[in-house]
Curated annotation (Swiss-Prot):
Its main location: cytoplasm. Gene3D superfamilies: Probable inorganic polyphosphate/atp-NAD kinase, domain 1, Probable inorganic polyphosphate/atp-NAD kinase, domain 2. It comes from the Eukaryota. This is Uncharacterized kinase C24B10.02c. One of its GO terms (molecular function) is NAD+ kinase activity. GO terms for cellular component: cytosol; nucleus. The lineage of its organism: Eukaryota, Fungi, Dikarya, Ascomycota, Taphrinomycotina. The modification Phosphoserine is found at residue 420. It comes from Schizosaccharomyces pombe (strain 972 / ATCC 24843) (Fission yeast). One of its GO terms (biological process) is NAD metabolic process. SUPFAM superfamilies: NAD kinase/diacylglycerol kinase-like. Keywords: Cytoplasm, Kinase, NAD, NADP, Nucleus, Phosphoprotein, Transferase. Pfam families: NAD_kinase (PF01513), NAD_kinase_C (PF20143). Disulfide bonds: none annotated.
C-alpha cells in the first residue's frame, strides 16, 4: 500500500501539473514552473482518493481520545498540504491565462469605467484565445459598453463574456486568472465565489494605496497586467478555515450537517440582538478548552488578524504563518485571553443546552445564521487555500504602518508661554482665556454682564 508521502507526490504530479522549465529558460529564480492549465487538473482534487478527515457528531467528539485516528489523519493532511503549497510558493510561474474573471466593487461608477479600460487592455495585449468574463450586470451598462470596447480593441465581441455566482460554483476550473477591482471586501467576495478550488487572484486597490488584501495599485494597472500576462509571477497561498454548521435535534438527540462554508478572514460568533452575553463551550481537539461568557468569539486566520480580531484585542499575525486565532469579544471575565493555536487543531464551538439564548455566526461578514441550543460549529483549516499573486514591492509591515498610522501621531507638546505673532501686542496677563472644551449647552443670555 502506498505511503502518505507517495500519495502526496503522486497528487502533486497529477493534479498540479507542474512542468519544470528547461535550464536555458531559468532566470533569477532558482525554480520555475509552468502553470498553464493549472485549474483543470486541480479540479480533480475534490474527487481524488486522498483520505479526508472524518468529523464525528459533537456528542461523541468530546469523548474521543486525543490519539483518535480522525485527529491524527487531519493533522497529517494539513501538514502534508502545507508542505506541498510551500514547495509551490518557492517558484515563479507562467500563468498564460485564457479565461480571465474580473470582479468589480459595486456602487462605484468610476470602477465600471476602469473595468472597461482593463478589459480593453487585456484584449489588446492578450492572445486571440484570451477571453474576459465580467459581471453579468454590466451586459447592458452604458458605462461599460462591450461593443465600444471590442471596436476600440479591434477584436471580436465574443471575447467578452459574462459571469454570475452560479458559473463560479459549478465550473470554477474554467478560469485561469481572477482580477479584483475594489477593496478588501471585493477580495472576500471572490473567496466566497470560489469556496474550494479557484484561480490565482490579482487584486487592485481602488484608492491606489495597497491594503492588507489588495496588493496592487489601480493607477499602474497596465504595468502589473503586462507582467502577469507575459512574465513569471510569484504566488502566495493564504490559509482558509472550513466552518461546518451542525444542528441539534431535540427529539432524536442527533446532529445533522446544515452547511459548510470557507472563510478567508474570520468566523464571528456573537450574541446578536439578544441582551444576554453569549455562553459558548469551546472544545480544542476533543477536549473542553474553556467556557466563553462574552459578547462573542472570533476565530480568524492570519490573513484576518488585522480585522475584527484586532478590534477585539487579538494579536497581529503575518499571513505567511500557519495558525488559528481565537479571540473573545468583550469577555465577562479576564480568565479567557486571545490565543493562537496551530493550524492543524480542530475547534468546536457549542451553544450549551442550558444557554439563556441563541447566538449568531457569520463567515467573512456575510449574512448571520442563528445557532440554537445544542448547535455547534466545527472549525478546521481547509485543504483549499486562497491563491493570490504577490507584489514584489508589497510589505505587510509597511501596510500596517500606513493603515494603522504607526509613528504618525504627534506627541503631546508642553504648554508654551512664548508669544506667537498674534500675541505680540497682547499685554494681558498670562492666563488662558479658553482652558478646555466646553460641553455645557446652557449659556447666559447676557454675555457682556
Amino acid at each position: 500500500m502506498a505511503t502518505k508521502v507517495e500519495e502526496i507526490n503522486k497528487l502533486k504530479k497529477k493534479n498540479l501539473h507542474f512542468r519544470q522549465c528547461s535550464a536555458d529558460s531559468l532566470s533569477n529564480s532558482s525554480m520555475q514552473f509552468d502553470l498553464s492549465g493549472l485549474n483543470t487538473p486541480v479540479g480533480e482534487l475534490a474527487t481524488s482518493n486522498l483520505p479526508s478527515p472524518a468529523h464525528p457528531p459533537f456528542g461523541e467528539l468530546h469523548q474521543e481520545s486525543r490519539t483518535s485516528n480522525s485527529s491524527a489523519m487531519h493533522i497529517e493532511n494539513v501538514v502534508a498540504s502545507r508542505l506541498m503549497y510551500n514547495e509551490v510558493a518557492n517558484g515563479s510561474f507562467a500563468l498564460e491565462p485564457k479565461n480571465i474573471l474580473v470582479v468589480t466593487k459595486p456602487r462605484k461608477h468610476s470602477l465600471v469605467y476602469k473595468t472597461a479600460e482593463i478589459t480593453k487592455y487585456i484584449l489588446t495585449i492578450g492572445t486571440p484565445e484570451t477571453k474576459v468574463y465580467v459581471d453579468m450586470r454590466l451586459a447592458r451598462s452604458k458605462r461599460f459598453s462591450a461593443h465600444n470596447i471590442a471596436k476600440e480593441a479591434n477584436t471580436d465581441i465574443d471575447r467578452i463574456k459574462y459571469w454570475n455566482p452560479y458559473i463560479c460554483l459549478i465550473k470554477p476550473s474554467i478560469f485561469d486568472l481572477a482580477i479584483t477591482i475594489g477593496d478588501n471586501s471585493t477580495l472576500l467576495y471572490t473567496s466566497w465565489l470560489f469556496q474550494k478550488i479557484g484561480p490565482p487572484v490579482l487584486s487592485f486597490s481602488d484608492d491606489d494605496v495597497p491594503g492588507f488584501l489588495t496588493h496592487f495599485s489601480l493607477s499602474n494597472y497596465q504595468q502589473h497586467l503586462y507582467q502577469v500576462l507575459t512574465q513569471n509571477v510569484s504566488l502566495r497561498f493564504c490559509s482558509r478555515l472550513q466552518c461546518s454548521f451542525h444542528k441539534y435535534d431535540e427529539k432524536t438527540k442527533q446532529y445533522s450537517l446544515a452547511s459548510t462554508t470557507y472563510s478567508l478572514d474570520e468566523i464571528l460568533i456573537s450574541r446578536g440582538e439578544h441582551p444576554f452575553i453569549s455562553n459558548l463551550n469551546v472544545y480544542n481537539n476533543s477536549e473542553l478548552m474553556t467556557v466563553v461568557q462574552a459578547d462573542g468569539l472570533v476565530v480568524a486566520t492570519p490573513t484576518g488578524s488585522t480585522n475584527i480580531s484586532a478590534n477585539a484585542g487579538g494579536s497581529l499575525v503575518h499571513p505567511a504563518l500557519n495558525a488559528i486565532l481565537v479571540t473573545p469579544v468583550c469577555p465577562h471575565t479576564l480568565s479567557f485571553r486571545p490565543i493562537i493555536l496551530p493550524d492543524y487543531n480542530v475547534l468546536n464551538v457549542e451553544i450549551p443546552l442550558d444557554s439563556r439564548s441563541s447566538a449568531f455566526f457569520s463567515v467573512d461578514r456575510h449574512e448571520s445564521v442563528e445557532m440554537h441550543r445544542g448547535d455547534y460549529l466545527s472549525i478546521v483549516t481547509s485543504h483549499y487555500p486562497f491563491t493570490t499573486i504577490q507584489n514584489p514591492g508589497y510589505q505587510w509591515t509597511k501596510v500596517l504602518e500606513d493603515k494603522f498610522n504607526w509613528n504618525v501621531r504627534e506627541r503631546q507638546k508642553p504648554f508654551s508661554r512664548k508669544p506667537s505673532l498674534s500675541d505680540v501686542k497682547d499685554t494681558s496677563d498670562d492666563k488662558f482665556d479658553i482652558t478646555d472644551n466646553s460641553y455645557c449647552r446652557e449659556f447666559s443670555a447676557d454675555i457682556d454682564g
